[in-house]
Structure formats: C-alpha cells, structure tokens
C-alpha cells in the first residue's frame, strides 16, 4: 500500500475533530508542533490503496494573519500547508454555514494543492431547510465535494474512495481580482525563490498585498519590494487588502447563489429556544453553576460507585498479591514490604482515580461537543469584562477543569498581551482533574453525605480566587480595558458516542500514564526513606524514619492551617504535590498505609485472590445499585460509598491525624491554591517568562496560606482565641502590604510576553513531547 500524508483543515466548530476521530479511531498520537506549545494530533487509517497519516491542523477561519499579536493557529496551518509535507488536504466545511466556511476553501484552492472538500453537518443543514447541490458545488470549486454527517459516520467510505482517486484540482479561475492586483502579485512572484511553484508564488504575492505578515518569510527578496508595490497600488485603489477580501466574498456569494438556498435558510428553532434560557442575563449564571455542580456530582457518585472494582481489585493484585509472592518465595521482609508498599501501593493509588477522573473527562467532552461550553463563555462575559478581560478568556479557564497546562496554553487565542498574561496568572486556580482525585478521597473521609457539596465549593472557590486575582492585577500592575468579544455559537447537537469515548480515552490515558509514572516512583522513594533513620539504620516504627524526622522540623510552619506536628505525612504530601497534584494522594496513601500496616500482619495462608476480586465486583455492584436507587436520586447530595470503610486502612489513619473536618477542608484549600505542578510552571514560563512564573508561584503560595489560615482559625477560634486572632490579623496585614507594593510597582512592570515564535520551517516539524493533554 502506498503511504499518503493528509492535512485536515477547517473552521472551528465545523466537526473537524469528530471526523478525525471517525477516521483514525484510537490510532492517534498527541504532541506539540515543534517550537510552540500548540497541540498537534496525528492519526493513522487505511483506505483500499493507501496507508494514510492524517494531521489535524488547528481550526482557523483563514490563512491570513494581519498581526503578530493574534493566535498561532493561522501561522501553523499556513506553514504546514506551504511546507509541502501534505500530499493532499481535506477541507472540512460546515454545510449550515457554507458562505463563511468557503473563504478558507478559496484560499486553499488558490494554492493549487490537491484538495477534497468534506461537506459536513448536512443533518443540521437539512433541519434548517438548507439545500446544497453537491455536484454543482464540486464543478464550481474544481475539486471533489463529499457529503458527510461525521457524527453518524455517513459518507466516511465515500471520503476514503475519493482519497484513493485524488488528483490535482481542475484549473478553474475562482476569484476575479482587479487587474492591478494581479499585475503586482505577479511582479512580486517573479522575485520569489524559483523552487516555489508559480501558483503558490502568486498566492503568496496576494497574501502579502492583503497584509499577511508570515507570507513574507517565504517571499525572499520580494518582501523588500513590498512597500514600493503597495505604494503603487494605492495610487489606483484605496485599500488593496479590502479589494482582495471583497473579490473573494463576491466569488463566494456567486457560488452560494448557484448551489444553495442559504439566503432563505431558517435558524435552528431548538438552538434558538434553548439559548433564550441558557443565555438569559438572570438565568445564565445559575444554570452554568448547576451544570458544573452536576458534573462533580456525577464524578463523585458514579465514579465513586465504580471505585471498589479498581481499589479493592488493585489491592488484591498488586499489594496482597505481591506480599503473598514475597512470603511464598521467602523474600526478605524489607523487600516484600518495599515492593508491596512502594510499587504495589503506587499502582493502587493510581487505579482508584480512574473512574472519577474518567467521569469528569467524559462530562467535559459532552459539554464541549454539545455546544454548551461556548455559551458558558458568553454567560461569563459580563464578569470577565469587569476584570478587563473578554469573555473569550473564560474558555481556556474552563479547559483548566481538565488540566491547567492546556488552560495556560489556551491563552494564546487572546489578542492582547495583557489579556493573555492575566489569563495565564488566573489559570492555576482552576481546579484540575488531579485535584479532584484529592478532593474525592477527603470527601469520602470527612464530609459524608455532603461530599459532593464540599467538592463543588472548592471548585467554586478556585473560580472566585481566579476572579479576585484578575481584579487585583487589573487595579495594580495590569490596568486596561478588554477588547470586544465576538465568538461563534455552534448549533446544539447530541455528541457522537464514538467521538466522546475517544476524546475521554485520550485525556484519561494521558492522565494515568503521567500520574502513574510519577506516583509509582515517588511511592518507591518514600517507602525507602520511610524505612531508614537519618543514621542509615532500618527502623521498625516509621515515626523514627528519616522522612519523619525531617518533616517534623517543617510541619510547624503549617500549624496555622490545621496541620499538627504528628501529621507530618500531610507536610510531605504538599512538597511532593508540587511535582504533580495527583502525587498528594499517592504520598498520603503510602505514608498512612505504612503507619497502619504496623498493626496489621498479612497472613499468606488466608490470602485468596479469587475471593478478593469477587468482593471487589460485588461491592461495586452494590454501590452502583445504591447510587441509582430512588432514595439517592431524590436526595442527590449523597457521597460516594465506594471508597471503603473509614475505621481501617490509610483513610482511618488520615481521619485520626487531621482530627476534624475543618482541618481537612483547610488543607484542601491550600492544595487547591498553592504552587501549580511542574508541568504548569513550565507552561507559564514558556508562555510568559520565568519572572512571571515566579510571581505566579509566590502569589499562589500567599493566597493558599492566607485563605487556609483564615478559614481554619475562624473555624477553631473558640479553642484558642488569642492565637487565632494573631494569625488572622497577621495574614490581613501582610496582604495589605503586598497589594500596596504591587500598586507602587505598576510603572516598572513589563507585561509583554516572551517571543514564542520560532523559525518558519521549525513550526512545521512534529514534536511528540507533550505536557499534559
């Protein structure tokens, strides 16, 4: 079979991702475009004659970039197309928005690269009474047009057949430009590098005349003639860029008049009706908060009900199983405990996170694909405008519910450096999936039936602190007004199940692999440091270990937030959590289990793997029945019952160490707000600078310590009023001084972002080094 590389390009919300998932299935690889932190996805699929590598290009409305301050999407798409890496392009076009989508199509066809138009979302177009003559459109464009409904898999085989039959586009003159424009474009083309095909040189000439700043990188000496060329043109026409765009839109209008009835189309009645409620100025925000709460409720309840299968099952296989092998094969006791607690305990920490994190990713994917997430940005626009930010900046913040790294990277879609930087500083406060894993464990241990409500309150606290951070920056070192907010709202539709599963799987797989590697390594090292004293001797009591001795010295620093000296394990969790937040659970599980295991002797004669696995399945089944019982549905704030008994195991020790729900909640506040993980810190440094990364770390530590201290000291005020009052006043005074210093430093702060654009050629190469996707 012949190998073929295809670039997949289209407007945002055109169904490009769904088509990519339909074609490639699970055969996908996620990384970054070389030199930039924009995600690059590749997938593999086969046709009758070809083995295809499909490259998913960023969604973009055109290939023209007027300002270097705009997002990188147009630059990356243009660079890849001009690089010659793609043998063929598939342009995904939204049939319900044909006129707008055809602008990008015309630019692609003018380049002369073989192209297939995938006319998607025909089902939505039909509901709006839009009729499109496929053959007529194909004849006018001079390339194959394949009708598709990617959410249902309709037209996929026809698209594969068209790929096998692909050939150069017919030489059809689509756009009739004014003769002076063509003459000057040809004059520029003559002085461009001769290795570029003539048609592409003419296209680059038009792009330069339109004001595209990145086409100059390919133009060679022609870029030096641009100013003189524009001066000559302005003697004949006012604005060359306007004439070029107008010629294209006239061509699009002529095509649409012949092949479709878009002018008489009816808007989606369902979308219009729902938007009257969802976008209502009074109901929009409560609906958004309810949707967020529902997401956490499902993640905690349904994910928690599935947890015994992963928790009890992994204990049976990787903890008790390793212990049984160790005793049976007469391993040394220290080696058996080391393997069971370190390796087995690390695996046992990762696997129980899967159901709850997976449920949250599934729900997020559903909200994104259904079209609701775009509405959430509009709902939050008024609030974001108060911060001096457009509502568009809330979109990357919502992405932060999954992971803060793409949230920081998503700030690139904003136009102004000030808006990008403010959004980057706010992003770490959005509670990610790794934090949900911590919250879920503490919710089951301390908050009983109010577990989901406790988790919801922490997520809302993260949003509130992000908003307050934005306000602080606006009135201190980043004063300014927001740019107007314009964003396309896609039509509501039911997401395709296959696409949902693939998106959820990609996110969950990335989380588990990343978390698993770190947690298992940390668990092994913690087990080692927990087994020896500072003098190097093996200890029987972990409270005499080197880790305990060092941690006890540091723990008093966290006394104001409710961490007592004997709870040194919680201090270790905060330090390891700086690597990755999910490691907090692994650390606490390893250390609390080590303390508990001293009182629990494992008897290999009583070990029965089949019984323990059956117990895991039975407990999961009972939990699912309880979760979907009528009583729970009538009273939805019912915490997960799949986390095990509180009287035994690591959770029992944790309950004793913290001593109260107030201390546990204060600890969670600190975990929510303090230092972001290493991946996020790296993303902040790349997207801004190391200085701003340092500011983000210090500000987060201050907010976390201040808020956790205020909460715990108010909650426990009656126990030690004098100490609590001193702590509260000290925190308030420190923050007043800090904000005052920031106001004075405003004139000396540079809010420009680091230059992140590499050479033209480097952006076309693939990089498989991902951060956190």
Swiss-Prot record:
Binding site for GTP: 120-123, 149-151
One annotated GO molecular function: ferrous iron transmembrane transporter activity
Membrane topology: Multi-pass membrane protein
GO CC annotations on file: plasma membrane
Residues noted as binding GTP 2 in the record, renumbered to the chain: 35-39
Transmembrane domains' residue ranges: 282-302, 309-329, 344-366, 383-403, 427-447, 453-473, 518-538, 664-684, 691-711, 722-742
Localization annotation: Cell inner membrane
Residues annotated to bind GTP 3: 56-59
InterPro entries linked to this entry: Fe2_transport_prot-B (IPR003373), Fe2_transport_prot_B_C (IPR011640), FeoB_Cyto (IPR041069), FeoB_GTPase (IPR050860), G_FEOB_dom (IPR030389), Gate_dom (IPR011642), P-loop_NTPase (IPR027417)
Keyword Nucleotide-binding: yes
Inducers of expression: Iron uptake is repressed by the global regulator Fur.
Pfam families given in the database record: FeoB_C, FeoB_Cyto, FeoB_N, Gate
Domain FeoB-type G, first and last residues per copy: 3-169
SUPFAM superfamilies: P-loop containing nucleoside triphosphate hydrolases
Swiss-Prot/TrEMBL keywords: Cell inner membrane, Cell membrane, GTP-binding, Ion transport, Iron, Iron transport, Membrane, Nucleotide-binding, Transmembrane, Transmembrane helix, Transport
Binding residues annotated for GTP 1, in chain numbering: 10-17
Organism superkingdom: Bacteria
Family: Belongs to the TRAFAC class TrmE-Era-EngA-EngB-Septin-like GTPase superfamily. FeoB GTPase (TC 9.A.8) family.
Record's function text: Probable transporter of a GTP-driven Fe(2+) uptake system.
UniProt xrefs under PANTHER family: FE(2+) TRANSPORTER FEOB, FERROUS IRON TRANSPORT PROTEIN B
Protein name as it appears in the record: Fe(2+) transporter FeoB
Organism from which the protein derives: Shigella flexneri
Gene from which this protein is expressed: feoB
């Amino acid at each position: 079979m012949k190998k073929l590389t295809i670039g997949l390009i289209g407007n945002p919300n055109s169904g490009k991702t769904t088509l990519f998932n339909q074609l490639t299935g699970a055969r996908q690889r996620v990384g970054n475009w070389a030199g930039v932190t924009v995600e690059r996805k590749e997938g593999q699929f086969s046709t009758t004659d070809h083995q295809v590598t499909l490259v998913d290009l960023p969604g973009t409305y055109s290939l023209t970039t007027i300002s270097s301050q705009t997002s990188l999407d147009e630059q990356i798409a243009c660079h890849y197309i001009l690089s010659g890496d793609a043998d063929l392009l598939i342009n995904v076009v939204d049939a319900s928005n044909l006129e707008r989508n055809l602008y990008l199509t015309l630019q692609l066809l003018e380049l002369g690269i073989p192209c297939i138009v995938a006319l998607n979302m025909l089902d939505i177009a039909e509901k709006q009474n839009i009729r499109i003559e496929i053959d007529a459109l194909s004849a006018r464009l001079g390339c194959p047009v394949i009708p598709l409904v990617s959410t249902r898999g309709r037209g996929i085989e026809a698209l594969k057949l068209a790929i096998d039959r692909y050939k150069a586009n017919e030489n059809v003159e689509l756009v009739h430009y004014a003769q002076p424009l063509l003459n000057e474009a040809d004059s520029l083309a003559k002085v461009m590098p001769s290795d570029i095909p003539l048609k592409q040189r003419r296209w680059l000439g038009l792009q330069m005349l339109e004001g595209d700043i990145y086409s100059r990188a390919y133009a060679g000496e022609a870029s030096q003639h641009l100013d003189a060329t524009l001066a000559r043109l302005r003697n004949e026409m006012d604005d060359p860029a306007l004439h070029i765009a107008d010629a294209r839109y006239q061509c699009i209008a002529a095509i649409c008049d012949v092949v479709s009835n878009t002018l008489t189309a009816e808007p989606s009645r369902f979308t219009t009706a729902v938007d009257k409620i969802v976008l209502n100025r009074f109901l929009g925000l409560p609906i958004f908060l309810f949707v967020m709460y529902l997401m956490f409720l499902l993640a905690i309840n349904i994910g928690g009900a599935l947890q015994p299968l992963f928790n009890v099952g992994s204990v049976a296989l990787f903890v008790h199983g390793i212990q049984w092998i160790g005793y049976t094969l007469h391993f040394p006791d220290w080696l058996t405990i080391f393997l069971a607690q370190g390796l087995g305990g690390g695996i046992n920490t990762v696997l129980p996170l899967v159901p709850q994190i997976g449920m949250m990713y599934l729900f997020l994917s559903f909200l994104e694909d259904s079209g609701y997430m775009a509405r959430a940005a509009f709902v939050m626009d008024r609030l974001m405008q108060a911060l001096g930010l457009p509502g568009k900046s809330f979109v990357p913040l919502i992405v932060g519910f999954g992971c803060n790294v793409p949230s920081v990277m998503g700030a690139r879609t904003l136009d102004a450096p000030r808006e990008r930087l403010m959004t980057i500083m706010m992003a770490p406060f959005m509670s990610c999936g790794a934090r949900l894993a911590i919250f879920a464990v503490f919710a089951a241990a301390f908050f009983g039936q109010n577990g989901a409500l406790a988790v919801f309150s922490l997520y809302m606290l993260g949003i509130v602190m992000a908003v307050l951070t934005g306000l602080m920056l606006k009135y201190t070192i980043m004063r300014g007004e927001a740019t107007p907010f314009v964003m396309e709202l896609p039509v509501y539709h039911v997401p395709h199940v296959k696409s949902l599963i693939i998106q959820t799987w990609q996110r969950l797989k990335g989380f588990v692999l990343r978390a698993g590697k770190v947690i298992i390594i940390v668990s092994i090292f913690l087990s080692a440091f927990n087994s020896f004293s500072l003098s190097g001797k093996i200890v029987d009591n972990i409270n005499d270990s080197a880790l305990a001795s060092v941690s006890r010295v540091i723990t008093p620093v966290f006394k104001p937030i409710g961490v007592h000296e004997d709870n040194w394990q919680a201090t270790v969790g905060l330090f390891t959590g700086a690597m990755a937040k999910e490691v907090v659970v692994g650390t606490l599980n390893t250390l609390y289990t080590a303390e508990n295991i001293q009182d629990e002797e494992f008897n290999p004669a009583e070990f029965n793997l089949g019984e323990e696995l059956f117990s895991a399945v039975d407990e999961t089944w009972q939990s699912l029945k309880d979760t979907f019982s009528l009583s729970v549905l009538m009273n939805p704030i019912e915490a997960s019952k799949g986390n095990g008994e509180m009287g035994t195991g690591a959770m029992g020790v944790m309950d004793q160490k913290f001593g109260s729900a107030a201390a546990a909640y204060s600890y969670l506040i600190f975990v929510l707000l303090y230092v972001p993980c290493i991946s996020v810190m790296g993303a902040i440094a790349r997207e801004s600078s190391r200085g701003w990364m340092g500011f983000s770390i210090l500000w987060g530590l201050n907010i976390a310590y201040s808020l956790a201290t205020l909460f715990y000291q108010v909650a426990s005020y009656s126990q030690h009023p004098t100490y609590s009052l001193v702590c509260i006043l000290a925190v308030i005074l420190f923050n007043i001084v800090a904000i005052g210093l920031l106001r004075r430093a405003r004139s000396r702060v540079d809010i420009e972002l680091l230059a992140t654009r590499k050479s033209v050629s480097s952006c076309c190469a693939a990089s498989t080094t991902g951060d956190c996707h």
